[in-house]
Curated annotation (Swiss-Prot):
Name by which UniProt lists this protein: Gag polyprotein
Region (Interaction with membrane phosphatidylinositol 4,5-bisphosphate): 73-77
GO molecular function: RNA binding; structural molecule activity; zinc ion binding
Domain notes per entry: Late-budding domains (L domains) are short sequence motifs essential for viral particle budding. They recruit proteins of the host ESCRT machinery (Endosomal Sorting Complex Required for Transport) or ESCRT-associated proteins. p6-gag contains two L domains: a PTAP/PSAP motif, which interacts with the UEV domain of TSG101 and a LYPX(n)L motif which interacts with PDCD6IP/AIP1.
Placement of sequence motif Nuclear export signal: 16-22
Region Interaction with Gp41, annotated ranges: 7-31
């Protein structure tokens, strides 16, 4: 089957490439969008050959439309592409995707308002009326017959379960594959799942609960039914356990119809949601962007978890607008807040595309260094020094206010530390400054040695002496008497030596 790049040719291709992707945007549709759409249809087990005609595009749109509300962005983009392609095939002039969607919506409303033609058996009436959803198709006689699911559809469903297990993306896949199916077809899809029997048992319990609720809200009529009237389906009939395929088709095609297939499919989706929540226990509140994680990967994880959340579409929209920005890393959060609350997802991803790369890291580092230098200069200018500033002094001339490298005086020879020539101060091996013979430090360039007497002129007090009173005279006389007594005692104990004869015998100096 492959990617169909030859869906449009000639003038239709020119018309296709003239349509804008968004209202007021600059990007237009290209041939690569057709190739992508055909591959996506193959992935959803749909026939890409239907893209060649307007009727085929309408069938694909009708099949994908029920899953658009809970589908991903890729599924919505596929439906938008098919809508534009339908307008090109039908020669409906449109300028962008939104106009194409509006045209299709208007056409569907007009078709619903038209009265049904009584001659349903003719070929013209069959072509003019919208065909029933697959697998209920209309034969040549105008009768609705059942066409079972193809093995290819069942194989696609089994592969999704094997590859994705019960990730959130299996729900829109199930919705796309089971569109218009009868309860018997849905049971065939469930029976093809070989593994995950615990999940299948949970699904059966949910179906039984919904069937019991149906029986409670739709009680059976009392008494026998009139001849020719069909009985109302019970919960087990909707689940396909107590009803035949003919009864299911009759209920779905009666007037008014009873969509037992859609009801049963809704029950299965409820059970799949519970299983997905069990297999994916991560809450949307726990999805946060890592410091080095690209914004694109973070958005993928966010929407994957959001799909498994059991909430209405309004709540999911609020989560997207609030949590997507709140749980981003600081770099992306700063960019997203600058965009404003009305930014689209495309604008967010474009703005945060380079975050985390080498260029962004270099820019952030440069800004941080510039801020640090600015803060340092402001700190110096304001003079926020708590301690006393140390005055700088030149080693060359000895003056204060500048350093030796900025000194304008002639450069002095020798070491600035010890005064000797032959080496510099950085290579000086002397422990201290040059010392004089008294061991005191002495600069050889100015000043004088420490052994010179340092005379300082001190001012003597010029105040008159204190007046003496009687008590002070008594104290002074007592002090003098005590001193004289002490001197007499020392003289009596240690008589003065008048010569050295008592110590050395004959005094040599006296001879």
């Amino acid at each position: 089957m492959g990617a169909r790049a030859s869906v449009l040719t000639g003038g239709k291709l020119d018309q296709w490439e003239a349509i804008y992707l968004r209202p007021g945007g600059k990007k237009k549709y290209r041939l690569k969008h057709l190739v992508w759409a055909s591959r996506e249809l193959e992935r959803f087990a749909c026939n890409p050959g239907l893209m060649d005609t307007a009727n085929g595009c309408a069938q694909l749109i009708n099949q994908l439309e029920p899953a658009l509300k809970t589908g991903s962005e890729g599924l919505r983009s596929l439906x938008n592409t098919l809508a534009v392609l339908y307008c090109v095939h039908s020669n409906i002039p449109v300028h962008n995707t939104q106009e194409a969607l509006d045209k299709i919506k208007e056409k569907q409303e007009q078709h619903k308002s038209e009265p049904k033609k009584p001659e349903a058996g003719t070929a013209a009436a069959a072509d003019s009326s919208i065909s029933r959803n697959y697998p209920l198709v209309q034969n040549a006689q105008g009768q609705m017959v059942h066409q079972p699911l193809t093995p290819r559809t069942l194989n696609a469903w089994v592969k999704v379960i094997e590859e994705k297990a019960f990730n959130p993306e299996i729900i829109p896949m199930f919705m796309a594959l089971s569109e218009g199916a009868t309860p018997s077809d849905l049971n065939s899809m469930l029976n093809t799942v070989g593994g995950h029997q615990a999940a299948m048992q949970m699904l059966k319990e949910v179906i039984n609960e919904e069937a019991a609720e149906w029986d409670r809200t739709h009680p059976a009529p009392v008494g026998p039914l009139p001849p020719g009237q069909m009985r109302d389906p019970r919960g087990s009939d909707i689940a396909g356990t107590t009803s035949t395929l003919a009864e299911q088709v009759a209920w779905m095609t009666s007037n008014p119809p009873i969509p037992v297939g859609d009801i049963y499919r809704r029950w299965i989706v409820l059970g799949l949601n519970r299983i997905v929540r069990m297999y994916s226990p991560v809450s949307i509140l726990e999805i946060k962007q890592g410091p080095k994680e690209p914004f694109r990967d973070y958005v993928d994880r966010f929407y994957k978890t959001l799909r498994a959340e059991q909430a209405t579409q309004d709540v999911k929209n609020w989560m997207t607008e609030t949590l997507l920005v709140q749980n981003a890393n600081p770099d992306c959060k700063q960019i997203l807040k600058a965009l404003g609350p009305g930014a689209t997802l495309e604008e967010m991803m474009t703005a945060c595309q380079g975050v985390g790369g080498p260029a962004h890291k270099a820019r952030v580092l440069a800004e941080a260094m510039a801020q640090a230098q600015t803060a340092t200069s402001v700190f110096v200018q304001r003079g926020n020094f708590k301690g006393i500033r140390k005055t700088i002094k030149c080693f060359n001339c000895g003056k204060e206010g500048h350093l030796a490298r900025n000194c304008k005086a002639p450069r002095r020879r020798g070491c600035w530390k010890c005064g000797q020539e032959g080496h510099q101060m950085k290579d000086c091996k002397n422990e201290g400054x040059q010392a004089n013979f008294l061991g005191k430090g002495w600069s050889p360039f100015k000043g004088r040695p420490g052994n010179f007497p340092q005379t300082t002129t001190r001012r003597e007090p010029t105040a008159p002496p204190l007046e003496s009173y009687g008590s002070q005279e008594e104290k002074s006389t007592q002090g003098k008497e005590m001193q004289e007594n002490q001197e007499k005692t020392e003289t009596s104990l240690y008589p003065p030596l008048t010569s050295l004869r008592s110590l050395f015998g004959n005094d040599l100096s006296s001879q």
